[in-house]
Amino acid sequence: MMVLSGALCFRMKDSALKVLYLHNNQLLAGGLHAEKVIKGEEISVVPNRALDASLSPVILGVQGGSQCLSCGTEKGPILKLEPVNIMELYLGAKESKSFTFYRRDMGLTSSFESAAYPGWFLCTSPEADQPVRLTQIPEDPAWDAPITDFYFQQCD
């Protein structure tokens, strides 16, 4: 398997086309601000080499990979940004499950399930400019259910 020299760059939008962007050290999903279109955060992505590659385990970072999305190590999953270098996680031999998401491809969109908390997925709120968080997918989702499908496109 080839070893990456740096993280891959992706941009993420939810299926309602809200872009993921950073504000006050929080990852939010939104669109227009004062008539300016937000370009969206560059998301640094590396595979987690310690976990089963067939499950597409990925580690997601922001700010050039200097901070990574983590589900924490508490009793319940809490999504937060931790000041950990994405390449250290990539090159390290640890499982780093709290930083890992299984990317599930669903045609045009993908969902991201926490490796540390199975059944919990990255999601956005239907309202704009709310934090990205984790949710369990309900049996019969209501119209205002969290959005768990994302467009995941490599940066130009």
From Swiss-Prot:
Disulfide bonds join C9-C155. InterPro entries: IL-1_CS, IL-1_fam, IL-1RA/IL-36, IL1/FGF. Highly abundant in embryonic tissue and tissues containing epithelial cells. Belongs to the IL-1 family. It comes from Mus musculus. One of its GO terms (biological process) is inflammatory response. Interacts with cargo receptor TMED10; the interaction mediates the translocation from the cytoplasm into the ERGIC (endoplasmic reticulum-Golgi intermediate compartment) and thereby secretion. Inhibits the activity of interleukin-36 (IL36A,IL36B and IL36G) by binding to receptor IL1RL2/IL-36R and preventing its association with the coreceptor IL1RAP for signaling. Part of the IL-36 signaling system that is thought to be present in epithelial barriers and to take part in local inflammatory response; similar to the IL-1 system with which it shares the coreceptor. Proposed to play a role in skin inflammation. May be involved in the innate immune response to fungal pathogens. May activate an anti-inflammatory signaling pathway by recruiting SIGIRR. Disruption phenotype: In combination with transgenic IL36A exacerbates skin abnormalities (acanthosis, hyperkeratosis, presence of a mixed inflammatory cell infiltrate and increased cytokine and chemokine expression). It comes from the Eukaryota. Bioactive (processed) recombinant IL36RN inhibits effects of IL-36 when used in 100- 1000-fold molar excess. GO terms for cellular component: cytoplasm; extracellular space. This is Interleukin-36 receptor antagonist protein. The gene is Il36rn. GO terms for molecular function: cytokine activity; interleukin-1 receptor binding. Keywords: Cytokine, Cytoplasm, Disulfide bond, Immunity, Innate immunity, Secreted. It is found in: Cytoplasm; Secreted.
